Amino acid sequence: MKKVTTELREIVTEFTTKIGAISAAEFSAKPLANKWSKKEVLGHLTDSAQNNLRRFICGQYEVEPPKITYQQDFWVASNNYQAMQKEEIIELWRLMNLRICAVLENMPENLYSKECDTGSLHTLAWIAEDYVKHLKHHLNQIIFESFDVIYV
């Protein structure tokens, strides 16, 4: 888990600065009416962080694997990230990810193998690793070719 949290902290530090350097116009521009702007992609990553944080916490103590799923388009629309200030969404994303690092670093190793239902059953260790892959995939949508990652 240390590898995951180290990598996540490095990504958050680097991309807080890189994303902050994107102009407000570019950050808010929608490629198509039905596609997310870079701002909304970062909002989606914030929603992902919120839902995964819940998985990492509830997954430790629930007797049965908790089912924690979410409808990503609804979350992005409900949060209305497109109307948020650029600095606010970046800071929210940054803080949520640092909280994930803190929770994962505090998690006893014997709980890494506990499962959570994300639509299918996965261990908390797997979810943590997948979270970073998912993050990289979407950061590539904000700053092209930042990572060599294939995420399906």
Cite the ranges covered by each PLM segment:
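Alpha-helical bundle segments that constitute or directly flank the non-heme di-iron/ferroxidase center
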Residues: M1-A24, D47-C58, K133
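Amphipathic, non-membrane alpha-helical segments in soluble helical-bundle scaffolds
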Residues: M1-R9, K35-L42, K86-I90, A125-A128
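Short leucine-rich amphipathic alpha-helices used at interfaces
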Residues: V4-T5, V12-T13, I89, L139-N140, ...
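Acidic/histidine-rich alpha-helical segments that form the ligand environment
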Residues: E7, I11, K18, V76-Y112
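N-terminal start-of-chain detector that recognizes signal peptides
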Residues: T13-F15, A29, E62-E64, R99-C101
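A short secondary-structure junction motif
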Residues: F15-K18, I22-A25, V63, M107-N110, ...
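Short, contiguous alpha-helical
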Residues: S28-Q72, K114-V152
